[in-house]
């Protein structure tokens, strides 16, 4: 019997850690992929390593990219301040085409591994309004994946799974806690320091804090 494999995008944050735990619970052999893309919050990479180890993934890859060479985002260009108050429209923390790039590389690895499922922790309920977190984007990428690959053309097919898509942050936290995720290991803050401590002010910090509060669970986040 063939092993059921999945490639999972793992940023080191709360959502992606939960997705790894969910995939493992569903019986997948988990292969996780993180990206060192020039992000200001590089502490998330150490968090991803910790999560991958805690959840006993088969293999964890860190891919180097130079998205700060493109810029255009507060996460990759330190001359753009990370907003510390809610904003209208798509915020400056949006990284141009990031999820398209990340999923494309995950797709390549999945094809090599013979994995047919790719998991991503995007969410369209408690989220920052990024266009590449919407269900329409996920569905469109899946169609493209099955048109653009040898495996897809030969009928083996890929599925892009976004199991958090319609969950609130509180629901995500409760689910991950039940599955044994140690959220103290994760880093969500857009401007976390080198030790992984959070600012408590950015959009990601606010969503995370509200999720734990609504879930009625202790927030293990460390702040600077």
Swiss-Prot record:
Zn(2+) binds at residues 189, 199, 202, 205. Pathway: Purine metabolism; 7-cyano-7-deazaguanine biosynthesis. Disulfide bonds: none annotated. CDD domains: QueC-like. It catalyses: 7-carboxy-7-deazaguanine + NH4(+) + ATP = 7-cyano-7-deazaguanine + ADP + phosphate + H2O + H(+). The keyword Magnesium does not apply. Its cofactor is Zn(2+). Keywords: ATP-binding, Ligase, Metal-binding, Nucleotide-binding, Queuosine biosynthesis, Zinc. Binds 1 zinc ion per subunit. Pfam families: QueC. HAMAP family: QueC. Belongs to the QueC family. This is 7-cyano-7-deazaguanine synthase. It comes from Stutzerimonas stutzeri (strain A1501) (Pseudomonas stutzeri).
């Amino acid at each position: 019997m063939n092993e059921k494999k999945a490639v999972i995008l793992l940023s080191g944050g709360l959502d992606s850690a939960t997705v790894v735990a969910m995939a493992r619970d569903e019986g997948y052999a988990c292969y996780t992929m993180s990206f060192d893309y020039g992000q200001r919050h590089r502490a998330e990479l150490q968090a991803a390593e910790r999560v991958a180890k805690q959840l006993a993934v088969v293999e964890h890859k860190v891919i180097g990219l130079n998205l700060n060479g493109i810029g255009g985002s507060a996460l990759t260009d330190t001359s753009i301040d990370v907003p510390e108050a809610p904003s209208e429209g798509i915020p400056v923390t949006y990284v141009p085409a990031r999820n398209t790039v990340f999923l494309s590389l995950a797709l390549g690895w999945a094809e090599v591994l013979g994995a047919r499922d790719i998991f991503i922790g995007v969410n369209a309920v408690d989220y920052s309004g990024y266009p590449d977190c919407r269900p329409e984007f996920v569905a469109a990428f899946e169609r493209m994946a099955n048109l653009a690959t040898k495996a897809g053309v030969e009928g083996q097919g890929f599925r892009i799974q976004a199991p958090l898509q319609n969950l609130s942050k509180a629901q995500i936290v409760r689910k991950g806690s039940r599955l044994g995720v140690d959220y103290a290991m994760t880093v969500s803050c857009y401007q976390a320091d080198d030790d992984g401590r959070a600012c408590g002010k950015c959009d990601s910090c606010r969503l995370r804090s509200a999720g734990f509060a609504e879930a009625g669970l202790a927030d293990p986040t460390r702040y600077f």
